[in-house]
């Protein structure tokens, strides 16, 4: 479950943590996203938080958070595209299309997840 605490909205889907190099490298490649994947980055930066849609089968919703779990950017990433967030991020949430519509994240909103 992913919760926008600022708006009291939630997405009830499954959440997994990309807690290894391999999981972070593969992300949602070669998969139809049916769950959200949370990336915990070692540093809060823009470049290290950049993402790509190489080998992805569908577009995904992506939410970038700072070290205080506040939204710094939101996008929908199409397959075969590259995206660099507008601000430094420490956490990235990749999920199926519809995630954004469920929790309506905007700059500054506080987001939490539960596995």
From Swiss-Prot:
Domain of life assignment: Archaea
InterPro entries: DUF192 (IPR003795), Saro_0823-like_sf (IPR038695), UPF0127 (IPR022906)
Any matching Pfam family: DUF192
Family indicated by similarity: Belongs to the UPF0127 family.
Name of the protein this chain belongs to: UPF0127 protein PH1112
Species of the source: Pyrococcus horikoshii (strain ATCC 700860 / DSM 12428 / JCM 9974 / NBRC 100139 / OT-3)
Taxonomic lineage from the root: Archaea, Methanobacteriati, Methanobacteriota, Thermococci, Thermococcales
């Amino acid at each position: 479950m992913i919760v926008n605490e600022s708006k009291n909205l939630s997405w009830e889907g499954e959440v997994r943590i990309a807690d290894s190099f391999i999981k972070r490298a593969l992300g949602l490649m070669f998969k139809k996203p049916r769950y959200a994947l949370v990336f915990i980055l070692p540093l809060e930066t823009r470049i290290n938080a950049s993402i790509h849609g190489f080998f992805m089968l569908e577009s995904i919703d992506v939410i970038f958070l700072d070290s205080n779990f506040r939204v710094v950017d939101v996008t929908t990433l199409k397959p075969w595209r590259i995206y660099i967030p507008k601000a430094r991020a420490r956490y990235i949430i990749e999920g199926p299309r519809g995630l954004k519509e469920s929790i309506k994240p905007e700059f500054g909103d506080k987001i939490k997840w539960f596995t």
